[in-house]
């Protein structure tokens, strides 16, 4: 892979055109990322996804960002994967949602709201 840091593309091989957004300043994960860098990363992700979709003629697009080992994080420097998708590409980014009761959903919502206030 040809990796450059900052707003340059880091080309990977998961899918034709798979790239990374990799900030120059270190943050191990999203929790350590400054609000300013988080905003810049998302704005760049939108611009790159739009340009890559037009350039590569892909059928869809995934933007993936993992935090913590159990979530699949293996590189402990914040980064976002930009993954162009093509019909029949067999790239495996799927999960099977569980089911929660309305009471469980409400409890989760209340706990998160408490942390936000």
Predicted segments, located by residue:
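Short histidine-centered catalytic/ligand-binding loop motif
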Residues: 20-42, 94-101
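A short glycine-rich, hydrophobically flanked beta-strand micro-motif that places a catalytic Asp/Glu
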Residues: 57-68
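Acidic pyrophosphate-coordinating catalytic loop
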Residues: 68-75
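C-terminal helix-cap and adjacent tail motif
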Residues: 84-117
């Amino acid at each position: 892979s040809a990796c450059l840091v900052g707003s340059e593309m880091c080309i990977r091989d998961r899918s034709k055109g798979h790239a990374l957004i990799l900030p120059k300043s270190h943050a191990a994960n999203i929790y350590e990322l400054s609000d300013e860098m988080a905003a810049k990363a998302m704005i760049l992700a939108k611009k790159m996804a739009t340009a890559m979709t037009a350039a590569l003629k892909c059928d869809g697009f995934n933007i993936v960002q993992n935090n913590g080992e159990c979530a699949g994080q293996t590189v402990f420097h914040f980064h976002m994967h930009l993954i162009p998708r093509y019909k029949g590409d067999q790239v495996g980014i799927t999960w099977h949602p569980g089911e929660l009761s309305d009471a469980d959903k409400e409890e989760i919502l209340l706990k998160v709201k408490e942390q936000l206030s």
